[in-house]
From Swiss-Prot:
One of its GO terms (molecular function) is arginine decarboxylase activity. This is Arginine decarboxylase. Its EC number is 4.1.1.19. Belongs to the Orn/Lys/Arg decarboxylase class-II family. SpeA subfamily. Gene3D superfamilies: 1.20.58.930, Alanine racemase (3.20.20.10), Lyase, Ornithine Decarboxylase, Chain A, domain 1 (2.40.37.10). The modification N6-(pyridoxal phosphate)lysine is found at K141. Keywords: Decarboxylase, Lyase, Magnesium, Putrescine biosynthesis, Pyridoxal phosphate, Spermidine biosynthesis.
Length: 702
């Protein structure tokens, strides 16, 4: 039966007298939760695909974090909603009074990822009879947060896990952190180099750090030779090779013969000859390559590793004292839960399969050439840090479904042209026939004609609204549209999810609560910036909208998952929206199941202004002085009470985060002015008195 035949439309539904127009009832949201469950939400949002083994929908309809992966016991699961409540509730209620957006870090997840990677390689080495070891490094560019890097060095110390740096600040950071790590841990020095960079790397060896200078450009060798002789340090040198193996995805653009980094075979031969000529060929000990991030399959991985292993064996034959093959990055994660490897969003292998493919490829080539098995190193940043960090943000408002009412149609047909009336009659006839296709055709025709007449000035806005209301109702009744609502979120896409804007990278985005309720709308997410690109309208699974719930007075919170790598490092300050608040959460046995060990309010407006070379202190004094001058004009002698109120308001605005303060985060104003750093008994207790976070200056409102 045609869709329109199901609608009880009276004969006068489209007449000039709109008192009898049929208006469909609003959907009953109370029935949305019937026959729904967290398991259905888990399937809808693919949580079991991309989230395993760290995230799941619990029986309460909230996202649970499993901090120890598949080894997590039921009582160790952490309800993410409880963490958010602890972070954002006012201090008077036992909370930390932090403001959204909020990054929640789980060091336990980070530890599990690191140990899982190590275990995967150790298992492959043991089962395949490989006669060396795996010794990885974390590329700090993925996320340079101090506590993340310190955790990685601590967690990986027992198996010599090291760091990779690609710039002078990163090398300083890595050297400092590795002073507390294993003395055998690698400090792999990649990237473009000048004399200062090379000098820092050589200084690292003087400090008994295991630094390796990897040649990315042939001319870097002259610097290394000259400076090492000058400071009397015998360097350990690696070289990066440009392989022929290349993967076709976005992340493969840095690989292949035309890649940005690395040496060709001709350049490699020249490097070997020069090192031999100066008596330093024994310093060449590491071969590095990088196929590209998010390697989709083990077949491609094996091709690249096999090619590199052949180069490694050739360097051994040429007399280099080779010891390490560094396979670079590329260990991918499954952003969409499909495990297909058919796009940059997924990979078709597990950690264990990845490690097995690497070990098998190196072993096969080295055995063929009778070369001693090298130490295998990888730079697996994305796979290590992506899961441990969750970005939480709130939906502050949402567009409403427009329900057409008789008042919307009161000007329908008044003063319309004969052509518009003709279009209307055609639409009316199609509605009465239940002809869906003709209805859509005449709706479009009527709207276009009336828009043109409005532009010409022959229709008023009320008359145009009458046509719009009619057409919306008809389209809805025949099932011609499923309106997608816009949910406005307290977030900057450019700061917190820059890869979505820059390279169309998708991340799982899911409500962190109400998963026991059926979503009743589909929506896109619009951020706070004044930019048309500041929206999220593509989601995993090829969807252009996200199933969402109606907003209520209790807050609606969404989580972006698997964004622990790169997003924080790449974020910009478009519209001067700065960094989010951050909490660090450890699993603890007890009634709540977790402990917040560190909490930091996000960047204030003053912080962001200062980063752009403004002087917030001077700005504050200028505005305060202007207010005092105007006060004298309007009231002889001034109004000190009002002056103090204005100054206090300005001070709060400078010290507060740029994001909206709504719901539970309204206490952020107080927190932004007072004590901004929260420590548990695990960390050093500190409250710098009048000097907030990072030595924040205070404003005088006297």
């Amino acid at each position: 039966m045609p869709a329109l035949a199901l609608v009880d439309t009276p004969v006068d539904a489209f007449s000039g007298d709109c008192s009898g127009v049929f208006i469909p009832p609003s959907p009953n949201s109370s029935s949305a939760s019937l026959d729904w469950s967290p398991s259905l939400s888990s399937s809808l949002y693919r949580i079991d695909g991309w989230g395993a083994p760290y995230f799941a929908a619990n029986s309460s309809g909230n996202i649970s974090v499993r901090p120890h992966g598949s080894n997590t016991m039921p009582h160790q699961e952490i309800d993410l909603t409880k963490v958010v409540k602890k972070a954002t509730d006012p201090k008077s209620s036992g909370g930390l009074a932090l403001q959204f957006p909020l990054i929640v870090r789980f060091p336990d997840v980070l530890k599990n990822r690191l140990e899982s990677l190590q275990s995967a390689f150790e298992f492959a080495i043991q089962t395949q009879g490989y006669e060396s070891r795996y010794q990885g490094v974390y590329p700090v560019k993925c996320n340079q947060d101090r506590f993340i890097i310190e955790d990685i060095v601590e967690f990986g110390s027992s198996f010599r896990f090291g760091l990779e740096a690609g710039s002078k600040p990163e090398i300083l950071l890595a050297m400092s952190c590795l002073c507390k790590g294993s003395p055998e841990a690698f400090l792999v020095c990649n990237g473009f180099k000048d004399a200062e960079y090379v000098s820092l790397a050589l200084l690292g060896r003087k400090l008994q750090l295991n630094t390796v200078i990897v040649l990315e450009q042939e001319e870097e060798l002259d610097l290394v030779i000259a400076l090492s002789k000058k400071v009397n340090v015998r360097p350990v040198i690696g070289l990066r090779a440009k392989l022929r193996t290349k993967h076709s995805g976005h992340f493969g653009s840095t690989s292949g013969e035309k890649g940005k980094f690395g040496l060709t075979t001709v350049q490699i031969i020249r490097v070997v000859r020069k090192l031999r000529d100066v008596g330093m060929l024994d310093c060449l000990q590491l071969l590095h390559f990088h196929i590209g991030s998010q390697i989709p399959s083990t077949a491609l991985l094996s091709d690249g590793v096999s090619e590199a292993a052949q180069l490694y064996c050739e360097l051994v034959r040429l007399g280099a004292r080779m010891e390490v093959i560094d396979i670079g990055g590329g260990l991918g994660i499954d952003y969409d839960g499909s495990k297909s490897g058919e796009s940059d969003l997924s990979v078709a292998y597990s950690l264990e399969e990845y490690a097995a493919a690497v070990v098998a490829s190196v072993r096969f080539v080295c055995d063929q050439k009778s070369v001693k098995h090298p130490v295998i190193c990888s730079e697996s940043g994305r796979a290590i840090v992506s899961h441990h960090s969750v970005l939480i943000f709130e939906a502050v408002s949402a567009g409403k479904r427009h329900e057409t009412t008789p008042s919307d149609l009161q000007f329908l047909l008044e003063g319309y042209s004969e052509e518009a009336r003709g279009d209307y009659e055609n639409l009316y006839d199609a509605v009465m026939r239940g002809d869906r296709e003709s209805c859509l055709l005449y709706v479009d025709q009527l709207k276009q004609r009336c828009v043109e007449e409005f532009k010409e000035g022959s229709l008023s806005i009320e008359q145009l609204a009458g046509v719009d209301g009619l057409c919306e109702w008809v389209t809805k009744e025949i099932g011609g549209s499923d309106p997608v609502l816009t949910y406005n979120v307290n977030l900057s896409v450019f700061h917190s999810i820059p890869d979505f804007w820059g390279i169309d990278q998708l991340f799982p985005i899911v409500p962190i609560h109400r998963l026991d309720q059926r979503p009743v709308a589909r929506g896109i997410l619009s951020d706070l910036t004044c930019d048309s690109d500041g929206k999220i309208n593509k989601f995993i699974g090829g969807e252009s909208s996200l199933p969402l719930h109606e907003l209520d007075n209790n807050g609606y919170y969404l989580g972006m998952f698997l964004g622990g790598a790169y997003e924080e490092a790449l974020g910009g300050v478009h519209n001067l929206f700065g960094g989010p608040s951050v909490v660090r959460v450890l699993q603890k046995d007890g009634p709540h199941g977790f402990a917040v060990t560190r909490a930091m309010m996000g960047q204030s407006s003053a912080d962001v202004l200062r980063a752009m070379q403004h002087e917030p202190e001077l700005m504050f004094q200028t505005l305060k002085h202007r207010a005092e001058e105007l006060s004298l004009v309007h009231k002889p002698g001034g109004d000190k009470g009002n002056d103090k109120l204005v100054a206090s308001c300005l001070a709060r605005s400078f010290n507060n985060m740029p994001y909206l303060s709504v719901g539970t985060s309204t206490n952020a104003l107080t927190a932004a002015i007072n004590n901004l750093v929260y420590y548990s008994d695990e960390a050093a207790v500190g409250n710098g008195g009048g000097c907030g976070k990072n030595g924040k200056w205070s404003y005088s409102v006297d």
